[in-house]
Amino acid sequence: MVKRDKIGLTEEVHIRNTKVIARIDTGARRCSIDKQLAKTLNLGPVVDIRRYRSAAGHTRREVVEEEIILKKTKMRILLNISDRRRMKYRMLIGREALRKGNFLIDPLR
């Protein structure tokens, strides 16, 4: 049986030698990062522009590929850049990254 790292609903993520507290969201397919944080970290280049559906309607967002470390697991993921300044967490980790890292989510952590 493969050992799976347990993660909670929020986790510390390292991106470009910067610690960010990210929200783990199994309802989101992809990962997202705040546009101001992306600018501060100088993320890029933009690899795609995709259309996303949200409660506010449809938006087009830039997508970058970046390496992150989550629970000692290093992985390259796609991050869409969005305005998250009104959100509690500046980064969101979606299902694609969770599958890639083979994580087990423990909501009590």
Q: What spans do the regions from the language model cover?
A:
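Pepsin/retropepsin-fold aspartyl endopeptidases
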Residues: 1-109
